[in-house]
Amino acid sequence: MNTKFIDILFAFLVFSLPFKYIPRAFWQTFLGGPFGQDLVVYPLLIGFIYTAYCQWKYKNVVYKWDVFRKFIFAYLAVLLISLVWGLFNYPYYDQILNGPADQIEKLPRVLALLHGIGIPVAEKALLEIWMFARPVKGVLFEAFYTFGAVYMIFCWYHDRAQRAIDILLKVTTVDLVIAASYGLVDVCYQNGQMWAQNFITLTIPLLHGDVAAKFDYYQFHTHLFWDAQNRSIFLEPSYFGIYMAFAFPLLWWNIFKQTSKWKQAALVVLFTVLSFEIFLTQSRTALAVNCAVLAIFAVLCFYHMQKRLLFLLASLCLGVVISFAGSMEFMRFGQVPSQIGEWTPLATKWQNMQEKSHTNNINKQKEAQSVKEGITVKEQKVQSKAQAAKGTAGVNAQTYIDKNLKSLSGTDKKNAHAGSNHSRFTVQKTHIRIGLEHPLFGVGTTLWQGYLRERLDRDPGGEIQKWNKNIDKRGLLRAGFANLGDFTLRFAETGFLGLGLYLLPSLVLLLAYAKVLVKRHERIAPFLFCSLSFIGIMSTGLGDGMNITFCYWTAMAVSFLLLTANNVKFTLSFHFPKSSEARNDG
């Protein structure tokens, strides 16, 4: 196996992590599994092919195959049993068979092909075959592109873990520079600058597929512009935060490793800029997860009481304070007024506001009418200028926190996220109810949409009703509910057995990290930062899908490499060291 080629491939894989939902011409929906619409599918496909070739030719690639084989066979067995059981008891066949014929995009082409070569097949018969074959393919491909990819990366670097870590840190920093730079363009766009709007108009279709400037009730489209929320290069603002939950600890690790003060200062500035942009995402996912990761880092720093870690923590906290204050000032005085969910381009909106203000100032008829109504010309001009003012009135630290963090509780029905809260909590509660009704194997992988559609038929939530109407219009096999909680969804799909096996590698890693982090020793930094990256990206599964990006699986692979290279034992037992042990390890 050519290690230089592997290094290039792994660097490409790490670089591709932020680029989700690429232009449709580059999709690999048949072979790409859960990442068929993402750039990361290409290094994964190339890696699988090259690894299989090297193993076939040289017989020296796989490592610890017996351990992985036992796990993956057990995992696939549970998922396939769950699927077969779910299909056997599936109560919504009639709804699918009587649904729209185009709910499977490829079905008309397959029918035409079979008829063209003289094989007469009824549409419903082919649909029944498809209903079984499609979820089986989904189970196999997801396992292949997730746990299989983790094992592949582990085989690449099991004897040179430090090289994988160096590539990860360097390439992630490159991605962060790109994200920060594009995020500043987004800031200029939110400031109403037309050049930034034109730049986004040109580049977003190069980064993402199905771009639209107008809202479509039934069909998902990438927003060309994203109102008052900063999304940088990402598909949407929350994905910016999800990626940063993985990348921020790696950036901190890079800062910690630097020996040059100038490089350290430059990376701290990069962190401050990215924090500023994260605050401007106004995304609860982004803020909650990244604040939690920083809080855990602070606790670990005070636990270990190492000067370099405490100095880094102080630098990061200063950067957060500066970025938060800057974001508040920008939203109050520099941002074109906009509402979450608004589709109007902000530079165009600002231009229209200025033109309206100018027209009001020179319109004699309006001045005369204002005087008649008891408003002086001077007062009218003040009102005209206010119409063209930037910033949102009433924005301060308290209102921002109430809107973007406290709103996670879902208790305030008037906040901007109230509908989203209702959808998320309702769907997750329904997942849990479905799982408890089918506790052992769940309802079967990919078969949960019909159960949600039935149980939430009369739910008052506008977003939920939109998904219901979408299913009714396009069919259960083509439309459905968003994944609003990976762990609860997997519980509904695969029961306790499937969820337990899915989480088993993560639990083993978390316990191994805990065993290391609880000991006070000087070389704790690699374990601390890598564990934070893994915990940060894993926590996003509480409210979103784990396969939104490949970050979770990258963090898992690097975690196994780091811990294996340092001879950490992987067991499910754990004990806190005695005080004497802690002192000796220090």
Regions inferred by a protein language model and the residue ranges of each:
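Long extracytoplasmic/lumenal interhelical loops at the membrane interface
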Residues: 402-403, 408-409, 413-437, 441-494
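Hydrophobic, aromatic-rich transmembrane alpha-helices
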Residues: 1, 43-59, 246-258, 295, ...
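A membrane-periplasm/extracellular boundary helix in multi-pass inner-membrane enzymes
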Residues: 88, 181, 186-194, 302-415, ...
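Loop-to-helix entry and N-terminal half of a specific, functionally important transmembrane alpha helix
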Residues: 9-14, 266-275, 481-485, 492-493, ...
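Aromatic-anchored transmembrane helix interface
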Residues: 36-43, 96-155, 166, 176
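Transmembrane alpha-helices of multi-pass inner-membrane enzymes
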Residues: 43-49, 290-297, 306-313, 502-512, ...
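N-terminal signal-anchor transmembrane segment
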Residues: 1-91, 539
